[in-house]
From Swiss-Prot:
SMART domains listed in its UniProt record: AAA, ClpB_D2-small
Presence of the UniProt keyword Glycosyltransferase in the record: no
A GO MF label: peptidase activity
Gene that encodes it: hslU
Family per similarity comment: Belongs to the ClpX chaperone family. HslU subfamily.
Official protein name in the record: ATP-dependent protease ATPase subunit HslU
Record-linked PANTHER family: ATP-DEPENDENT CLP PROTEASE ATP-BINDING SUBUNIT CLPX-LIKE, MITOCHONDRIAL-RELATED, ATP-DEPENDENT PROTEASE ATPASE SUBUNIT HSLU
Purpose of the protein: ATPase subunit of a proteasome-like degradation complex; this subunit has chaperone activity. The binding of ATP and its subsequent hydrolysis by HslU are essential for unfolding of protein substrates subsequently hydrolyzed by HslV. HslU recognizes the N-terminal part of its protein substrates and unfolds these before they are guided to HslV for hydrolysis.
Keyword Nucleotide-binding in record: yes
Keywords linked to the UniProt accession: ATP-binding, Chaperone, Cytoplasm, Nucleotide-binding, Stress response
Length: 441
């Protein structure tokens, strides 16, 4: 997992997310504490439990984006799930234990890729020999069947192969198809059974190989994957994946407010919502979940929950669940200045995205500071006057603003300058007419 310090993690998040320093600091400290815990003695390590986080804030201010970026930084098994997908055991829908099963599958994939990288050099050597065997078939029954013939011809072909001179040449290779090709659909809540059936069917046809005629370049890719798969130890991968989940796993629970009881309502839906919360309790507190790869203890998995809490409050969650989310972080609503920074500062800001997209048609687009300030002001006004959807409003505003250039592309006069006057010409009437902006922006 990552060895970045909290300061470095916050700096990395700053490249994509504007503001929300308190939330960034909390997740950075939580992530660093995962690494710190792994440096402790075994006797103390088992006693240090993660401090789970509850992020509270309106929609579109960066809660989910923090999770997405954190997943890339973590270098640990990470899964993001929506709490609304799960139901109480006995109802139609997924049960909460499938979160851990999915997390284990993510870890298996991650550890397998790492294991393949570790044996990449050996796999490359074996791949090269198999391609040379296809290019220079050996005589049957010769004394070289079990020993490599390092003749001058083979060395010449090896040199050409490494230099890429034979990439376009077609050869016949024998490969074993990965998986059995079965795709089984199942109703919600039965994913585990489906997975086991697929595994069973794919194992039945595992040993059958087929001959394919492909180019050397494609053969190198296909054979490398097959040779790497032969070299890795599946049992060791399972053991490492389960250990990674138990010690470093992170679960991001989005939309947690949607399973909270809403005010004083006593509707039937609240029964199922409260059931989901009660099912989450043992996972967050620490329990053992059965997966097809083995038993997984959840005692040291970090849970980060988030929700907008428009129609409910954090106190509407059941008290036991509140107690298991001890760190509370409130994300702030975005200001006009935040909108302006969102349009310019991130490495993949919206303005840069549109400039790159339209440049493919030969249309150069330039944004002035006044134009960006006006776009930010309009987005904030519409949020303030209608429904506050945070930074997502910028997508709607920008799409409307650049609708004509996007349609005409290279037919428009280049360069196109987006200044305050152009923004007012395209969006001014919509921004001032609240009824119109309610439907269009």
């Amino acid at each position: 997992m990552t060895q970045m310090t909290p300061r470095e993690i916050v700096h990395a998040l700053d490249q994509y997310i504007i503001g929300q320093q308190e939330a960034k600091r909390s997740v950075a400290i939580a992530l660093r504490n995962r690494w710190r815990r792994m440096q402790l003695d075994d006797s103390l390590r088992g006693e240090v439990v993660p401090k789970n986080i509850l992020m509270i804030g309106p929609t579109g201010v960066g809660k989910t984006e923090i999770a997405r970026r954190l997943a890339k930084l973590a270098g640990a098994p990470f899964i993001k799930v929506e709490a609304t997908k799960f139901t109480e055991v006995g109802y139609v829908g997924r049960d909460v234990e499938s979160i851990i099963r999915d997390l284990v599958e993510m870890a298996m994939k991650m550890v397998r890729e790492q294991a393949k990288e570790e044996v990449a050099h050996k796999a490359e050597d074996a791949t090269e020999e198999r391609i040379l065997d296809a290019l220079l078939p050996r005589p049957r029954g010769s004394e070289y069947d079990h020993a490599r013939d390092e003749s001058s011809t083979r060395q010449t072909f090896r040199k050409k192969l490494r230099e890429g001179q034979l990439d376009d040449k077609e050869i016949d290779i024998e490969i074993t198809p990965q998986g059995g090709g079965f795709d089984i659909s199942a109703p919600p809540g039965m994913e585990e059974m489906t997975s086991q059936l697929q595994s069973m069917f794919s194992n039945m046809g595992k040993q059958k190989s087929e001959t394919r005629r492909v180019t050397v370049e494609e053969a190198r890719r296909l054979l490398h994957d097959e040779e790497a798969a032969k070299l890795v130890n599946e049992e060791q991968i399972k053991h490492r994946a389960i250990e990674a989940v138990e010690q470093n796993g992170i679960v991001f629970l989005d939309e947690i407010d949607k399973v909270a009881k809403r005010g004083d309502s006593g509707s039937g839906g609240d029964v199922s919502r409260e059931g989901v919360q009660r099912d989450l309790l043992p996972l967050i507190e620490g329990s053992t979940v059965s997966t097809k790869h083995g038993m997984v203890k959840t005692d040291h998995i970090l849970f980060i929950a988030s929700g907008a809490f428009h129609l409910s409050k954090p106190s509407d969650l059941i008290p036991e669940l509140q107690g298991r989310l001890p760190i509370r972080v409130e994300l702030q609503a975005l200001t006009p200045d935040d909108f302006k920074r969102i349009l310019t500062e991130p490495s993949a800001a919206l303005t840069k995205q549109y400039q790159a997209l339209l440049a493919t048609d030969g249309l150069e687009v330039n944004f002035t500071d006044e134009g960006i300030a006006r776009i930010a002001e309009i987005a904030w006004q519409v949020n303030d006057g209608t429904e506050n959807i945070g930074a997502r409003r910028l997508h709607t505003v920008m799409e409307r603003l650049l609708e004509e250039p996007s349609f005409q592309g290279g037919d428009m006069a280049s360069p196109l300058t987006i200044d305050a006057a152009y923004v007012d010409e395209q969006l001014g009437e919509l921004a001032t007419d609240e009824d119109l902006s309610r439907y269009i922006l």
